[in-house]
Amino acid sequence: MLKHIRAAGLLSLLLAASITAHAADMPVPAPPPPPPFSWTGIYVGGNVGGAAPGGSLTDSLFGIDFNLGTNTGFIGGGQLGFNYQIGGFVIGVEGNFDWVVTQNLHSQVSTPVGTIQATSNDTYITTAAARVGAAVDHWFLYAKGGGAWVGNNGFTVTNLTTSASITGLNSRTNSGWLAGFGVEWALTRNWTLKFEYDYLGFNNFNFAVPPTAPFIPGDTFTSNNRNIQMAQLGFNFLFNLGY
């Protein structure tokens, strides 16, 4: 009897060892692949770059144009937006706000009352635009279009011959439009880097210079083709909703 029990126990051990060895030889299923990257989601980020204003002023008294020279300045701010991806197509909206450090220095013009120069300083730029483009894995190539607004702390008109000047003329916010393009690259599922170029065109406006001795007679200036070109480097944190 004891002999049979020992034989049965030995058989059980051999059977268990055989099952264990067979299980060890079975292939382990591969982990599922990660979900494909998606640009869908809300994002927030920051940017820095440069801005180059353009355009001219025409005075009604002498009919002379004051051309805006090649001036560049620094911009820095942030953006908030939303993307929605459909296959390889992405649509979205974005709002930007940037502080501007630049001086708009218009050319010196000789007039019968002296050499006149006009300067102004932009203080901020804000935009609201749509972004539309193609997504290729971690890359997003897009075009951008919408509205733009620029804040200005007013013009200073100076008679360089007499050293007389008037400041704070026409401090205002000018409205206009924006058109641009850019490329964005996703480092991870949440962090992205981007480069963007934008052209901003603004509506023309008038402002008056009151007669002030020994300055110049009363005059009215009209802006022409007021524009700003911007190039930016930026980053975004994407709250990815696509997986």
Could you describe each region identified by the protein language model?
Residues 2-243:
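Gram-negative outer-membrane beta-barrel domains
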